[in-house]
Structure formats: structure tokens, C-alpha cells
């Protein structure tokens, strides 16, 4: 697993780690039950503070994407793909609701798309 970090990005590093792992799970690169790097290993690999990785892992655990069994054993949870699919569905529903609000204000779907693509 290769975590891509943009050190110049405004997105915090811990958030980039979360986004990378979520992406790899949704693409099937990381599979249910698969072990991932420990906090220390990832920190060394990325050349960052272990507390940054810990923050990312804490968020992933809260989202039920990973589980840490001991300080060295962290795994992708069994229902991770479903958790991410549910999140995607929720986000899409919110986007559709926003599009409906904009059409009620008089914008066509084409105008909305044009503005988004700017």
C-alpha cells in the first residue's frame, strides 16, 4: 500500500492518510481483514510524526474502517466496504437535494453542471 501525501496541500496530512485508505478500500486494493502498517511503521515510511498517523487511525477506527488489536496489529474491518458505500450514498443524496434546491431557484441542470465545471 502506497500512501500518497502532498506536503504542500492545505489538506492536513492525517486527513490525506484517511482519504488514501478509504480510497484503497473502495477500489478493493485493501481488502477486509487485511493487515495495514502499524502507526510507527507508517510514520517512519512517510517521515512524519507518529501522532499524525495516530490521529488518522483514530478517525478510521471511529468510521469503523480499521480495527487495532494491539499496538502493532491494525486491520481493515469486515464491513468496511459497506461503510464506505453507505457514505457515498449519503453524499450523493445530499448532492441531489442541493441540485433540487438550485432548480427550484430557477437554474437548469445544465447551468448547474456548467457552474460546477468552472
Regions found by a protein language model. Give the residues of each.
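Extreme N-terminal segment that seeds HTH/winged-HTH DNA-binding domains in transcriptional regulators
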Residues: 1-35, 89-118
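A short alpha-helical element within helix-turn-helix/winged-helix DNA-binding domains
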Residues: 35-46, 60
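Short, Lys/Arg-rich nucleic-acid/phosphate-binding segment
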Residues: 36, 68-76, 80-81
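Residue-level detection of the helix-turn-helix DNA-binding "recognition helix"
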Residues: 41, 58, 62, 81, ...
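Key DNA-contact positions within bacterial/archaeal DNA-binding proteins
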Residues: 51
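Terminal helix-turn-helix DNA-binding modules in bacterial transcription factors
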Residues: 81-89
Amino acid at each position: 500500500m502506497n500512501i500518497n501525501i502532498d506536503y504542500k496541500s492545505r489538506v492536513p496530512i492525517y486527513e490525506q492518510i484517511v482519504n488514501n485508505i478509504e480510497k484503497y478500500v473502495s477500489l478493493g486494493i485493501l481488502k477486509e481483514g487485511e493487515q495495514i502498517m502499524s502507526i510507527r511503521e507508517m510514520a517512519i515510511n512517510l517521515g512524519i510524526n507518529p501522532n499524525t498517523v495516530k490521529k488518522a487511525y483514530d478517525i478510521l477506527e471511529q468510521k469503523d474502517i480499521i480495527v487495532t488489536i494491539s499496538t502493532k496489529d491494525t486491520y481493515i474491518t469486515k464491513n468496511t466496504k459497506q461503510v464506505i458505500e453507505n457514505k457515498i450514498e449519503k453524499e450523493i443524496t445530499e448532492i441531489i437535494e442541493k441540485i433540487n434546491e438550485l432548480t427550484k431557484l430557477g437554474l437548469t441542470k445544465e447551468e448547474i453542471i456548467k457552474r460546477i465545471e468552472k
